[in-house]
Protein backbone atom coordinates (compact mmCIF):
# COMPACT_ATOMS: atom_id res chain seq x y z
CA UNK A 1 0.00 0.00 0.00
CA UNK A 2 1.49 3.34 -1.05
CA UNK A 3 1.91 6.20 1.45
CA UNK A 4 -0.94 8.11 -0.21
CA UNK A 5 -3.20 5.07 -0.08
CA UNK A 6 -2.56 4.44 3.60
CA UNK A 7 -3.08 8.14 4.32
CA UNK A 8 -6.49 7.98 2.67
CA UNK A 9 -7.47 4.83 4.52
CA UNK A 10 -6.38 6.10 7.92
CA UNK A 11 -8.47 9.23 7.55
CA UNK A 12 -11.59 7.33 6.51
CA UNK A 13 -12.82 5.98 9.83
CA UNK A 14 -12.18 4.71 13.34
CA UNK A 15 -8.79 3.19 14.22
CA UNK A 16 -7.65 0.83 16.96
CA UNK A 17 -4.58 -0.98 18.28
CA UNK A 18 -4.94 -4.62 19.31
CA UNK A 19 -3.31 -5.67 22.56
CA UNK A 20 -0.37 -8.06 22.15
CA UNK A 21 -1.19 -11.52 23.47
CA UNK A 22 1.23 -13.36 25.76
CA UNK A 23 1.38 -16.76 27.41
CA UNK A 24 1.45 -17.06 31.20
CA UNK A 25 5.26 -16.89 31.07
CA UNK A 26 5.21 -13.70 28.95
CA UNK A 27 6.07 -15.24 25.56
CA UNK A 28 4.22 -14.15 22.43
CA UNK A 29 0.95 -16.00 21.87
CA UNK A 30 0.50 -15.37 18.17
CA UNK A 31 -2.29 -17.91 17.69
CA UNK A 32 -4.49 -16.12 20.23
CA UNK A 33 -3.44 -12.74 18.81
CA UNK A 34 -4.48 -13.78 15.29
CA UNK A 35 -7.94 -14.82 16.52
CA UNK A 36 -8.42 -11.45 18.16
CA UNK A 37 -7.20 -9.41 15.17
CA UNK A 38 -9.36 -11.46 12.80
CA UNK A 39 -12.39 -10.72 14.99
CA UNK A 40 -11.59 -7.00 15.18
CA UNK A 41 -11.18 -6.83 11.41
CA UNK A 42 -14.90 -7.56 11.03
CA UNK A 43 -15.99 -4.31 12.70
CA UNK A 44 -15.10 -1.75 10.02
CA UNK A 45 -11.87 -0.39 11.45
CA UNK A 46 -10.15 1.93 8.97
CA UNK A 47 -6.80 0.49 10.10
CA UNK A 48 -5.30 -1.40 13.02
CA UNK A 49 -2.03 -0.58 14.78
CA UNK A 50 0.05 -3.69 15.52
CA UNK A 51 2.45 -3.39 18.47
CA UNK A 52 1.38 0.14 19.32
CA UNK A 53 1.38 1.65 22.79
CA UNK A 54 -1.59 -0.42 23.97
CA UNK A 55 0.09 -3.36 22.23
CA UNK A 56 2.95 -2.95 24.74
CA UNK A 57 5.46 -1.84 22.12
CA UNK A 58 7.72 -0.70 24.96
CA UNK A 59 8.12 -4.30 26.16
CA UNK A 60 8.73 -5.90 22.74
CA UNK A 61 12.01 -6.51 20.95
CA UNK A 62 12.29 -5.37 17.30
CA UNK A 63 12.00 -8.99 16.19
CA UNK A 64 8.87 -9.46 18.29
CA UNK A 65 7.37 -6.35 16.70
CA UNK A 66 8.02 -7.97 13.33
CA UNK A 67 6.38 -11.22 14.41
CA UNK A 68 3.32 -9.40 15.73
CA UNK A 69 3.05 -7.36 12.52
CA UNK A 70 3.25 -10.46 10.34
CA UNK A 71 0.64 -12.24 12.46
CA UNK A 72 -1.75 -9.30 12.13
CA UNK A 73 -1.27 -9.20 8.36
CA UNK A 74 -2.04 -12.91 8.17
CA UNK A 75 -5.64 -12.38 9.24
CA UNK A 76 -6.61 -8.70 8.77
CA UNK A 77 -7.95 -9.10 5.24
CA UNK A 78 -8.60 -5.70 3.68
CA UNK A 79 -7.88 -3.82 6.93
CA UNK A 80 -4.44 -2.13 6.75
CA UNK A 81 -1.91 -2.89 9.47
CA UNK A 82 0.26 -0.05 10.75
CA UNK A 83 3.20 -1.21 12.84
CA UNK A 84 4.69 0.45 15.90
CA UNK A 85 8.24 1.78 15.71
CA UNK A 86 10.31 3.79 18.17
CA UNK A 87 13.14 4.13 20.70
CA UNK A 88 16.42 5.74 19.63
CA UNK A 89 17.14 6.40 15.99
CA UNK A 90 19.17 3.27 15.23
CA UNK A 91 16.62 0.97 16.88
CA UNK A 92 13.75 2.81 15.21
CA UNK A 93 15.39 2.44 11.79
CA UNK A 94 16.04 -1.25 12.46
CA UNK A 95 12.43 -1.78 13.50
CA UNK A 96 11.12 0.11 10.47
CA UNK A 97 13.02 -2.23 8.18
CA UNK A 98 11.81 -5.31 10.06
CA UNK A 99 8.13 -4.35 9.90
CA UNK A 100 8.35 -3.35 6.24
CA UNK A 101 9.72 -6.82 5.48
CA UNK A 102 6.95 -8.31 7.64
CA UNK A 103 4.32 -6.75 5.39
CA UNK A 104 3.22 -3.65 7.32
CA UNK A 105 1.16 -1.11 5.39
CA UNK A 106 2.51 1.83 7.38
CA UNK A 107 4.46 2.87 10.47
CA UNK A 108 3.44 4.66 13.66
CA UNK A 109 6.56 6.36 14.99
CA UNK A 110 6.26 6.42 18.78
CA UNK A 111 8.40 8.74 20.94
CA UNK A 112 12.12 8.19 21.23
CA UNK A 113 13.25 6.68 24.51
CA UNK A 114 13.46 8.54 27.84
CA UNK A 115 15.42 11.71 27.10
CA UNK A 116 14.08 15.11 26.16
CA UNK A 117 15.21 16.46 22.79
CA UNK A 118 15.31 19.83 21.01
CA UNK A 119 13.36 20.42 17.82
CA UNK A 120 16.42 19.89 15.61
CA UNK A 121 17.01 16.50 17.23
CA UNK A 122 13.39 15.44 16.77
CA UNK A 123 13.60 16.53 13.13
CA UNK A 124 16.76 14.48 12.52
CA UNK A 125 15.28 11.44 14.27
CA UNK A 126 12.00 11.43 12.35
CA UNK A 127 13.70 12.14 9.03
CA UNK A 128 16.11 9.24 9.52
CA UNK A 129 13.22 6.84 10.06
CA UNK A 130 11.27 8.20 7.08
CA UNK A 131 14.37 7.95 4.89
CA UNK A 132 14.89 4.31 5.91
CA UNK A 133 11.56 3.01 4.60
CA UNK A 134 9.18 3.21 1.68
CA UNK A 135 6.19 2.93 4.02
CA UNK A 136 3.99 5.82 5.02
CA UNK A 137 4.96 7.13 8.46
CA UNK A 138 2.70 8.68 11.10
CA UNK A 139 4.41 10.91 13.66
CA UNK A 140 3.07 10.38 17.19
CA UNK A 141 3.43 13.61 19.19
CA UNK A 142 3.40 12.83 22.91
CA UNK A 143 5.39 12.60 26.14
CA UNK A 144 9.04 13.57 25.61
CA UNK A 145 8.81 13.85 21.82
CA UNK A 146 6.68 16.83 20.85
CA UNK A 147 7.40 18.42 17.49
CA UNK A 148 6.12 21.95 17.04
CA UNK A 149 4.25 23.10 13.94
CA UNK A 150 7.38 24.43 12.23
CA UNK A 151 9.20 21.13 12.74
CA UNK A 152 6.25 19.14 11.42
CA UNK A 153 6.13 21.42 8.37
CA UNK A 154 9.86 20.94 7.72
CA UNK A 155 9.45 17.18 8.01
CA UNK A 156 6.46 17.17 5.67
CA UNK A 157 8.51 19.03 3.07
CA UNK A 158 11.58 16.82 3.44
CA UNK A 159 9.80 13.45 3.77
CA UNK A 160 7.20 12.62 1.10
CA UNK A 161 6.26 9.47 3.01
CA UNK A 162 5.35 11.34 6.21
CA UNK A 163 1.61 10.98 5.88
CA UNK A 164 0.13 11.54 9.32
CA UNK A 165 0.23 13.39 12.63
CA UNK A 166 -1.15 11.74 15.76
CA UNK A 167 -1.54 13.82 18.90
CA UNK A 168 -1.19 12.45 22.41
CA UNK A 169 -0.43 15.76 24.13
CA UNK A 170 -3.97 17.10 24.39
CA UNK A 171 -2.63 20.54 23.50
CA UNK A 172 -5.39 21.70 21.20
CA UNK A 173 -3.59 24.95 20.41
CA UNK A 174 -0.58 23.02 19.10
CA UNK A 175 -2.80 20.65 17.12
CA UNK A 176 -4.66 23.58 15.58
CA UNK A 177 -1.37 25.24 14.63
CA UNK A 178 -0.27 22.05 12.89
CA UNK A 179 -3.56 21.56 11.04
CA UNK A 180 -3.62 25.21 9.98
CA UNK A 181 -0.05 25.07 8.72
CA UNK A 182 -0.19 21.68 6.97
CA UNK A 183 -3.80 21.45 5.80
CA UNK A 184 -4.50 18.29 3.83
CA UNK A 185 -0.80 17.45 3.43
CA UNK A 186 -1.23 15.08 6.42
CA UNK A 187 -4.01 13.05 7.98
CA UNK A 188 -4.70 13.88 11.63
CA UNK A 189 -5.38 11.35 14.38
CA UNK A 190 -6.43 11.80 17.99
CA UNK A 191 -4.31 9.71 20.33
CA UNK A 192 -5.17 10.62 23.90
CA UNK A 193 -5.78 7.80 26.40
CA UNK A 194 -9.48 6.91 26.07
CA UNK A 195 -9.71 9.46 23.29
CA UNK A 196 -13.50 9.32 23.32
CA UNK A 197 -13.29 11.73 26.27
CA UNK A 198 -11.56 14.24 23.98
CA UNK A 199 -13.13 13.37 20.63
CA UNK A 200 -15.67 16.17 20.40
CA UNK A 201 -13.10 18.88 21.12
CA UNK A 202 -10.56 17.45 18.68
CA UNK A 203 -13.25 17.07 16.02
CA UNK A 204 -13.84 20.80 16.34
CA UNK A 205 -10.26 21.56 15.26
CA UNK A 206 -10.28 19.19 12.30
CA UNK A 207 -9.09 15.93 13.89
CA UNK A 208 -11.95 13.75 12.70
CA UNK A 209 -10.58 10.32 13.50
CA UNK A 210 -8.84 8.71 16.45
CA UNK A 211 -7.59 5.41 17.80
CA UNK A 212 -10.03 3.72 20.17
CA UNK A 213 -8.62 1.44 22.85
CA UNK A 214 -11.99 0.02 23.88
CA UNK A 215 -12.57 -1.13 20.30
CA UNK A 216 -10.44 -4.08 21.47
CA UNK A 217 -13.38 -5.53 23.41
CA UNK A 218 -16.54 -3.47 22.73
CA UNK A 219 -16.10 -2.63 19.03
CA UNK A 220 -19.81 -2.03 18.40
CA UNK A 221 -19.93 0.54 21.21
CA UNK A 222 -16.77 2.22 19.94
CA UNK A 223 -18.22 2.50 16.43
CA UNK A 224 -21.56 3.77 17.73
CA UNK A 225 -19.80 6.55 19.63
CA UNK A 226 -17.61 7.39 16.64
CA UNK A 227 -20.59 7.62 14.28
CA UNK A 228 -22.42 9.85 16.74
CA UNK A 229 -19.38 12.11 16.99
CA UNK A 230 -19.14 12.44 13.21
CA UNK A 231 -22.87 13.11 12.94
CA UNK A 232 -22.86 15.66 15.76
CA UNK A 233 -25.34 13.59 17.77
CA UNK A 234 -24.53 14.89 21.21
CA UNK A 235 -27.39 13.06 22.90
CA UNK A 236 -25.97 9.67 21.92
CA UNK A 237 -22.45 10.75 22.84
CA UNK A 238 -23.52 12.05 26.25
CA UNK A 239 -25.39 8.86 27.00
CA UNK A 240 -22.39 6.64 26.20
CA UNK A 241 -20.00 8.93 28.07
CA UNK A 242 -22.07 8.76 31.26
CA UNK A 243 -22.89 5.05 31.18
CA UNK A 244 -19.51 3.77 30.03
CA UNK A 245 -16.59 6.10 29.38
CA UNK A 246 -16.63 8.23 32.54
CA UNK A 247 -16.73 5.25 34.94
CA UNK A 248 -14.30 3.37 32.69
CA UNK A 249 -11.81 6.25 32.95
CA UNK A 250 -12.18 6.34 36.74
CA UNK A 251 -11.25 2.65 36.89
CA UNK A 252 -8.40 3.16 34.42
CA UNK A 253 -6.92 5.91 36.57
CA UNK A 254 -6.58 3.79 39.71
CA UNK A 255 -2.98 2.81 38.94
CA UNK A 256 -0.16 3.86 36.65
CA UNK A 257 -0.10 1.64 33.58
CA UNK A 258 -3.76 0.70 33.81
CA UNK A 259 -4.60 2.30 30.41
CA UNK A 260 -3.01 -0.86 28.96
CA UNK A 261 -3.97 -3.33 31.69
CA UNK A 262 -7.66 -2.45 31.61
CA UNK A 263 -7.83 -3.09 27.87
CA UNK A 264 -6.24 -6.51 28.27
CA UNK A 265 -8.77 -7.32 30.97
CA UNK A 266 -11.58 -6.24 28.66
CA UNK A 267 -10.27 -8.46 25.86
CA UNK A 268 -10.26 -11.44 28.22
CA UNK A 269 -13.80 -10.65 29.33
CA UNK A 270 -14.78 -10.62 25.64
CA UNK A 271 -13.76 -14.27 25.41
CA UNK A 272 -10.16 -14.13 24.24
CA UNK A 273 -6.92 -15.16 25.96
CA UNK A 274 -4.59 -12.15 25.80
CA UNK A 275 -2.59 -13.26 28.81
CA UNK A 276 -0.96 -10.96 31.36
CA UNK A 277 0.68 -7.62 30.77
CA UNK A 278 4.46 -7.80 30.84
CA UNK A 279 6.27 -6.21 33.79
CA UNK A 280 6.63 -3.47 34.86
CA UNK A 281 2.87 -3.21 34.25
CA UNK A 282 0.46 -5.09 36.51
CA UNK A 283 -2.94 -6.63 35.83
CA UNK A 284 -6.27 -5.53 37.26
CA UNK A 285 -7.40 -7.05 40.54
CA UNK A 286 -10.35 -9.44 40.69
CA UNK A 287 -12.56 -6.70 42.12
CA UNK A 288 -11.60 -4.31 39.33
CA UNK A 289 -12.34 -6.94 36.69
CA UNK A 290 -15.83 -7.34 38.15
CA UNK A 291 -16.38 -3.59 37.90
CA UNK A 292 -15.25 -3.65 34.26
CA UNK A 293 -17.54 -6.61 33.55
CA UNK A 294 -20.45 -4.60 34.92
CA UNK A 295 -19.63 -1.66 32.66
CA UNK A 296 -19.46 -3.92 29.61
CA UNK A 297 -22.82 -5.50 30.46
CA UNK A 298 -24.41 -2.09 31.05
CA UNK A 299 -23.13 -0.84 27.68
CA UNK A 300 -25.09 -3.59 25.90
CA UNK A 301 -28.47 -2.67 27.38
Swiss-Prot record:
One of its GO terms (biological process) is D-glucarate catabolic process. Belongs to the DapA family. InterPro entries: Aldolase_TIM, DapA-like, Dehydro-deoxyglucarate_dehyd. It catalyses: 5-dehydro-4-deoxy-D-glucarate + H(+) = 2,5-dioxopentanoate + CO2 + H2O. The keyword Lyase applies. Pathway: Carbohydrate acid metabolism; D-glucarate degradation; 2,5-dioxopentanoate from D-glucarate: step 2/2. Gene3D superfamilies: Aldolase class I (3.20.20.70). SUPFAM superfamilies: Aldolase. It holds the Pfam family DHDPS. The keyword Lyase applies. CDD domains: KDGDH (cd00951). Keywords: Lyase, Plasmid. GO terms for molecular function: 4-hydroxy-tetrahydrodipicolinate synthase activity; 5-dehydro-4-deoxyglucarate dehydratase activity. Its EC number is 4.2.1.41. This is Probable 5-dehydro-4-deoxyglucarate dehydratase.
Amino acid sequence: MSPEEIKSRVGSGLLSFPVTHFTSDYKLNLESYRRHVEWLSGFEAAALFAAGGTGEFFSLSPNEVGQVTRAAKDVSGEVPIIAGCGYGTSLAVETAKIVEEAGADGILLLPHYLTEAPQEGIYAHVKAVCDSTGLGVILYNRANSVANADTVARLAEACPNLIGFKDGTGKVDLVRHVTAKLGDRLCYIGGMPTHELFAEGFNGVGVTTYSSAVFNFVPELAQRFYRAMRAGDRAVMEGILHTFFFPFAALRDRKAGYPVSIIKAGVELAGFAPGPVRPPLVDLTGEEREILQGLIEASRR
